[in-house]
UniProtKB/Swiss-Prot annotation:
Pfam families: Ribosomal_S15
Underlying gene: rpsO
Keywords linked to the UniProt accession: Ribonucleoprotein, Ribosomal protein, RNA-binding, rRNA-binding
Name used for this protein in its record: Small ribosomal subunit protein uS15
Cited function: One of the primary rRNA binding proteins, it binds directly to 16S rRNA where it helps nucleate assembly of the platform of the 30S subunit by binding and bridging several RNA helices of the 16S rRNA.
Region (Disordered): 1-25
One GO location term (cellular component): cytosolic small ribosomal subunit
InterPro entries: Ribosomal_uS15 (IPR000589), Ribosomal_uS15_bac-type (IPR005290), uS15_NS1_RNA-bd_sf (IPR009068)
Gene3D superfamilies assigned: 6.10.250.3130, S15/NS1, RNA-binding
């Protein structure tokens, strides 16, 4: 499952830090969160798809590492990102 190009560019433009930014932690976390959401919806109908579930767990771990990195570097950017994505309480 991949993101559609329109949705991907929409996320990049929303979370980028400067005009040509496509690889900052904010953008990467936003793209990973969208893929995680898509896979979560997939598992509501395909409960026994354990192969894809492993991929989901890898994505969640990668997002966690990026969030930890961002939190250690700049707490304000971290808080803005999690508020924008709605992924923490």
């Amino acid at each position: 499952m991949s993101l559609h190009q329109e949705r991907k560019s929409e996320l990049v433009s929303k979370f980028r830090t400067h005009e040509s930014d496509t690889g900052s932690p904010e953008v990467q976390v936003a793209l990973l969160s969208e893929r995680i959401t898509m896979l979560t919806e997939h598992f509501k109908t395909h409960k026994k798809d354990h192969h894809s579930r492993r991929g989901l767990l890898k994505l969640v771990g990668q997002r966690r590492r990026l969030l930890d990195y961002l939190k250690s570097k700049d707490v304000a950017r971290y808080k803005k990102l999690i508020d924008g994505l709605g992924i923490r309480k």
